[in-house]
Every structure is written in structure tokens, then in C-alpha cells.
Amino acid sequence: MQASIESTGNLERRLTFTLPQERLETHVGGRLRELARTTRIKGFRPGKVPTKVIEQRFGQQVRAEAMEGLLRETFDSAVREHSLRLAGNPRIDQGESDFDFVATFEVVPDFGDIDVTNLSVVRHTAEVTDADIDQMIENLRLQRRTWNPVERGAQVGDLVALETWSQAGNERLPAEGVETGSSVLGSGVMFDQIEKGLEGLSKGEDKALSIDFPADWRVPQLAGKTVQVHVKAVEVSEPVLPEVNKEFIKSFGVKSGDAEQFRADIRTNLERELKGALMNRLRREVGEQLIAAYAHVEMPPRLVENEAGSMLAQQVDQMRRSGRNPGEIPADAHQGFMDAAAKRVLVGLLVGEVARRNELRLESKRVSETLRLIASTYEEPEQVIEMYRNDPQLMSGLQSRVMEEQVIDWIAERAKHTEQSLSFQDAIRV
């Protein structure tokens, strides 16, 4: 195989290679003969379709498929021959002839010796208590609460239906009329000063509040200004929580309505949530230590740029889903994404290097356990398991996640670590 490699940057390489034409023709010819034996075409007996007809019908497709497969095979072979370790996907362009190609790609940087025993990691521990289960049941009651109108002044926990309008200098918002809405006091949904201003208001009462909005407030006309906000309580309602009886318990999928089974199911769900939260904390701990130890290593620029683009696209999507305008993202936010992306790439490459150098292998048992854990959050877990097993992309993502967790655990076990006990609530507050 003809292939040559050259460095075009600290971490960028250019590989020029030529496809073996005879192998391509052999593959194409073999595939066409196979189609001639198996393809049914009207007017011809099975297995008797002339090669010329097969060539006319399938030749272009067969040649394209063969070219794609041979291109990847030849490139991979050249990469192995030159002992290259790619960071990201290559860009492959046509060369001077139909069989000449030029691949441009980035390689994994040299991290030198990776000694994880010098890292200091805090491993957090926590457990689910009966009090945590009681609190979750209380939260479930809050989810099913109803509202009863009252004549007294509003207090924390009440639902207040309100009308508002604001005066920012010479500008009135809205220009005419009022804005309507509702908020549960203490929920943090509204601006804190407005929520506190609503406390004590009874149905029909109004108040003018002087509010200092921060410079980054989401409404440009109010940002950084002292604004007169006029509020009126249209209605005040107090919450009515349901009793924890059989009907309530059955509504959460416990067919028997048994209270002990209900608590057992809640414990299982909380323990699953806790396990994920503790792993996220450990992942962050290990990641921060790796970043601090290897921040001096240059990262592949294109890989970082791609990661930053993915992070920006994710934020835009999240803002659209929540009804916010992506235009609110500051113009200078790009550098922030680049910095975060560089750290994410650094940790990802280091995790891969640790796995490779220490010959860590994906544990199929752990993959199955994680899949069962994911599936248990759905009403039809067996269908979810089957969906994963039949979708290579989903399964690949799951395997990557499990492999990363294996490496994180491996690093934490060998690093200098201390244990810190947390309450359940503190542990899940990542």
C-alpha cells in the first residue's frame, strides 16, 4: 500500500494514500456475479441474467459501496501502519486521481506518564433514610394538591393570581392594559422582590413595588433599572394536600395500594437517583483533578472547536424548549464555550488513554446492570431493553457511558482519596 504521512501542525497530520485498484475491481466483479445469481429480473430466468444487464442496473451502486468500504479499510490500515491515534474523525478529500486520497486529521497529544496516584479525590457517600422517603411522599402530595380560594392575606405556599404592569422611566410595560399570571409564593418562579411584595396581599388589593432589576435581566427594557412594578392580587388560594390513602398510592402505580410497598418503591427510585448523583460527583472530582494536572497539554484545536459547537447547539436547543430566545446568548460567549470544551476534550482523551494504557475492558455485566437501571424508570422496562439492544447507536452510547464510569472508578480507587458523608439532599444537589 502506498501511503505517506506529514505533520501540518503540532497535532494535525496529513495522510496521502492510494487505493489498490485491483482489489476494488475484484470486489466489484465478485459482487456483480453474486447479484447475477440471486437477482430476479422480469424476462430472465433465475441465475441467467446477463452480466451487462446487472452492470447497467447495479454497477454504479456496487462500485460506490465498494469504494467506500475500501477507502475506510485502506485508511485504517495506513493509520495502524504509522501507529497513529486519531482524535476525532478525519476529513478525506480526493487526490490527483480517482484512486488517490488525502486525509487530514488530528492526533491524540502525548500526555507523558499518567500517574493517577498523585491525584487527590474526595469520594462522597450517602444513603437514603426514612426521612428522605417521608419528604418524597410530601413532594408527591404537593404534586397532587388542589387549591382553595381564601380571603386572608397571601403567604408562602399560596397560589396568587395577579395582574401587573411596570413603569421604567417614561416607558410603560405593557403599553396598554396589564399582564396576567399566577405564582406559588416561595417557589422562586418570579423575581424574588416581587414575590416578597405579594406576601400579605388579599384578593383585590394592589401595591406598587420599587424593584432593582439586575443588568443581565432577561427583559431588556427592565435590565439594570429601578422599576415601579404595580401588582394586584386577583385571587389568593391555599393548597389542599391529598391524604396518603390507598387511592393516592394506587395513582402512583402501586396496584395493591399497600403503604409499605409504596415506600419500598420510593426507596428504590431514590437509591437509583442517588447512585447517579454520586457518580456525577465522582466524575466531576476526577475530571477537575485531571484538568489541574494536565492543563499544560495542548488539545486538538478542531476537536475543541467541534465540542464547543455541540455545547452551543445544546444550549440553543434547551432555550428554545423552555420558550427563551437563543438571541439572549451573549456575542462573546464563544470563548466561554471554547474554554469549557477544551476541558471536556482533555478529560475525554485522558480517560481514553488511561483505559488504553491499562488495558481496561468494557464489563458486559455492568452494561446489563446499567441498562436494567435505565429501563426500570419506564412503565415497560422489557421494551426499553429490547429497543436498546436493537439500536446500535443507543447501545454504543450506553457502552461509552459505562466505560467512562469504569475508568473513573479505576482512577478514584488508585488516587489519594478521602471519604465525605453527605445527606441525600446534599448529595443529589450536584
Swiss-Prot record:
Keywords: Cell cycle, Cell division, Chaperone, Cytoplasm, Isomerase, Rotamase. SUPFAM superfamilies: FKBP-like (SSF54534), Triger factor/SurA peptide-binding domain-like (SSF109998), Trigger factor ribosome-binding domain (SSF102735). It is found in: Cytoplasm. GO terms for biological process: 'de novo' cotranslational protein folding; cell division; chaperone-mediated protein folding; protein transport; protein unfolding. It is an enzyme of class 5 (isomerase). It catalyses: [protein]-peptidylproline (omega=180) = [protein]-peptidylproline (omega=0). Residues 157-242 form the PPIase FKBP-type domain. Pfam families: Trigger_C, Trigger_N. Its main location: cytoplasm. It comes from the Bacteria. Belongs to the FKBP-type PPIase family. Tig subfamily. Involved in protein export. Acts as a chaperone by maintaining the newly synthesized protein in an open conformation. Functions as a peptidyl-prolyl cis-trans isomerase. This is Trigger factor. It comes from Xanthomonas campestris pv. campestris (strain ATCC 33913 / DSM 3586 / NCPPB 528 / LMG 568 / P 25). The gene is tig.
